[in-house]
């Protein structure tokens, strides 16, 4: 071979060698150094299945699971993988149209990027889930993911336990992107307050897909998987049997019941009427059910136990007595000559049910007979107390006592949206009366009226203070967090603090008030609250109620108020009952409270109580004006729907559709008031369009 040919051969070999080295180096770079293409390949072959954790279980005081978990399925979409897709078949299977399909896919890509799985449809109904599983290979980019949902086995405690729902973009932003699209979080009740405890930690499972988009097995034996961590449980003071009794007796009623263990502040039961089944806010129909509850003018979503503001009425009188005793204004033997009405302010009000002076000859009798004149006078003595220099200073001192009893401030219960109630300060009266007012101006504060407002929780807590002779623990549900951490301890410590707000008041003074409250049950207005062989201390109340309807303030039936604790010598339960528009407190509040106290203290109820229980569970005491208000709100909503859609199906029941489509022109008569024709709209429409389920408690 010539020298020239040998050189050319070497050059060609060298070129091949260099080219081979370059190719090997590039392959090494692509496959080892850079993970870009391996990631693309993996994304096409492997589905990262999100594993949602089970939320923590909530237990009652006896260890019964009152909030548990069940499994449903979410349909997830990864928009970037939706290719070669039979959209029409998919839409037919999912019972949606193509416009809805395109909208959901676009929203998923926008909110969570095109390469991340996002919820396409949450909580599939079982039949739809089965149809999808049979055809999943036809729909690349879609997959089913298990979703633990909440299950309420006792159908009770809806407002207290709360509910969960999918996080919103605002929730994600507030969390610093801790949450992702598709995550659920507590939205109300204990679910919201203890979210960090209950939520757990999501996991990821990598699953291989075949060329037909079917999930066929774990990728690399699961070495890249992350296990989901279940949430931790809560042990509560709630007695679910007591809770069920309370809710059944509040069926078809508006009001609330709160029962507390005085020695711990643990809430034994809390019911708010109208009641509803908490399972309505879980599962595939939850949004429809939520809308129904929101549009109910009776406000079932409003937890009246902590958000309802009521005049305490005569249930306030034991508190007023303790203020007067501690200020040295009276002794237990102090009497007042009442002849049926209070005349010291010259107006003969408030009236009293008794007209013989002996019924208020001392404090014990005044409490037992609920003398309005006696307690009105005690308030005026406190407000006009000379040692404070004037009515404004005396009033503010009186108000400080009420704040110590827990009125007019948030107690700090472990539920969201607690109302503080209302005890007006002097600025309210200065503004209303232009600085010219006296203790006669607001004298009915002494009997729990005027501008005073308290929640049922505050009233029950005030009974705890009397039962404990001066102290209380912040009312709360949770007794223990499973696997308690330092952060949990910091959260729980505020419920372990003993608030000695009125322990300086002597036992003798507390005993005088408690004796009077016992007499209320023995021979007074709370005789129907008596429990054999148990000393019960109680006070009834009846508070006036008004509402605004059709632009007018109308008088409704009175609210029935009731407070109690038992046993007198070793109190184990304190209770407050409010039944709106039910009338006398002893007739409705007393028996409801007795049945609950009897059940808790004896673990059963007598035949007499059982018979009464049947009556209270089947009697409808829903305020009559709510039916009128619901009709009004629904007619306004139907009118708005017709104006937006021209769909008359919702409005026919309220008015003649012909008059809406073609309003008749009314002939005007000279000299007469020619009012416009109202079409499916009642007066003061704007008030109820803004807050359709709101009505005023006064």
Q: Which positions does each model-derived feature cover?
A:
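Periplasmic/cell-envelope proteins involved in peptidoglycan metabolism and beta-lactam response
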Residues: 1-287, 309, 331-334, 394-402, ...
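Intrinsically disordered, low-complexity charged/polar segments
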Residues: 488-496, 612-622
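Beta-lactam-recognizing serine transpeptidase/beta-lactamase-like catalytic domain environment
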Residues: 210-215, 219-226, 263-314, 319-582, ...
């Amino acid at each position: 071979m010539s020298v020239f040919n040998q050189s050319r051969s070497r050059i060609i070999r060298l070129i091949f060698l260099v080219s081979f080295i370059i190719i090997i180096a590039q392959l090494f770079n692509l496959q080892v150094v850079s993970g870009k293409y391996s990631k693309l390949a993996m994304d096409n072959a492997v589905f990262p299945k999100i594993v949602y954790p089970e939320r923590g279980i909530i237990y009652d005081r006896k260890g019964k699971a009152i909030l548990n978990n069940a499994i449903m399925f979410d349909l997830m979409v990864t928009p970037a993988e939706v290719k070669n897709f039979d959209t029409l078949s998919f839409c037919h299977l999912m019972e949606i149209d193509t416009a809805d399909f395109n909208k959901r896919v676009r929203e998923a890509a926008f909110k969570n990027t095109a390469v991340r799985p996002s919820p396409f449809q949450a909580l599939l109904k079982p039949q739809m889930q089965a149809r999808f599983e049979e055809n999943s290979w036809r729909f690349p980019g879609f997959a089913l993911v298990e979703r633990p949902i909440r299950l309420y086995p006792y159908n009770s405690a809806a407002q207290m336990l709360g509910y969960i729902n999918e996080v919103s973009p605002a929730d994600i932003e507030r969390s610093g992107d801790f949450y992702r699209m598709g995550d659920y979080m507590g939205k109300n009740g204990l679910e919201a307050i203890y979210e960090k405890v209950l939520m757990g930690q999501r996991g990821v499972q990598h699953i291989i897909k075949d060329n037909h988009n079917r999930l066929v097995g774990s990728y690399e034996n699961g070495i890249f998987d992350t296990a989901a961590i279940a949430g931790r449980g809560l042990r509560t003071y709630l007695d679910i049997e007591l809770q069920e009794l309370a809710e059944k007796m509040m069926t078809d009623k508006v009001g609330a019941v709160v029962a507390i263990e005085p020695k711990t502040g643990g809430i034994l039961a809390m019911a708010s009427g109208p009641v509803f089944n908490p399972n309505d806010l879980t599962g595939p129909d939850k949004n429809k059910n939520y809308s129904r509850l929101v549009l109910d003018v009776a406000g079932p979503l409003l937890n009246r136990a902590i958000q309802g503001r009521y005049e305490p009425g005569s249930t306030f009188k034991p508190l007023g007595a303790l203020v007067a005793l501690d200020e040295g204004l009276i002794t237990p033997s102090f009497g007042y000559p009442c002849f049926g009405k209070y005349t010291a302010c010259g107006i003969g009000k408030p009236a009293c049910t008794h007209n013989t002076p002996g019924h208020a000859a001392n404090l014990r009798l005044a409490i037992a007979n609920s003398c309005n004149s006696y307690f009105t006078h005690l308030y005026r003595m406190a407000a006009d107390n000379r040692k404070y220099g004037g009515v404004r200073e005396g009033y503010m001192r009186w108000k400080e006592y009420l704040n110590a009893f827990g009125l007019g401030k948030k107690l700090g219960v472990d539920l969201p949206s607690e109302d503080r109630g209302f005890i007006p300060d002097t600025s309210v009266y200065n503004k209303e009366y232009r600085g010219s007012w006296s203790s006669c101006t607001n004298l009915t504060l002494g009997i729990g009226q005027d501008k005073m407002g308290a929640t049922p929780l505050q009233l029950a807590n005030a009974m705890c203070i009397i039962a404990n002779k001066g102290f209380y623990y912040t009312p709360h549900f949770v007794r223990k967090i499973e696997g308690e951490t330092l952060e949990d301890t910091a959260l729980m410590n505020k419920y372990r603090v003993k608030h000695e707000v009125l322990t300086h008041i002597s036992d003798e003074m507390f005993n005088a008030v408690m004796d009077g409250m016992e007499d209320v049950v023995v021979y007074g207005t709370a005789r129907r609250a008596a429990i054999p062989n148990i000393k019960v201390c109680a006070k009834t109340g009846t508070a006036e109620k008004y509402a605004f309807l059709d632009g007018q303030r109308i008088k409704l039936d009175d609210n029935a108020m009731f407070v109690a604790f038992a046993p007198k010598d070793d109190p184990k339960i304190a209770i407050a009952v409010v039944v709106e528009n039910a009338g006398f407190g002893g007739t409705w509040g007393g028996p409801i409270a007795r049945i609950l106290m009897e059940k808790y203290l004896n673990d059963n109820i007598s035949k007499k109580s059982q018979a009464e229980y049947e009556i209270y569970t089947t009697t409808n005491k829903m305020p009559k004006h709510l039916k009128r208000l619901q009709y009004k709100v629904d007619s306004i909503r139907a009118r708005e729907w017709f104006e937006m859609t021209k769909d008359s199906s919702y409005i026919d029941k309220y008015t003649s559709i012909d008059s809406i489509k073609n309003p008749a022109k009314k002939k005007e008569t000279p000299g007469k008031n020619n009012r416009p024709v109202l079409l499916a709209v009642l007066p003061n429409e704007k008030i109820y369009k803004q807050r359709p389920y709101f009505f005023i408690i006064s």
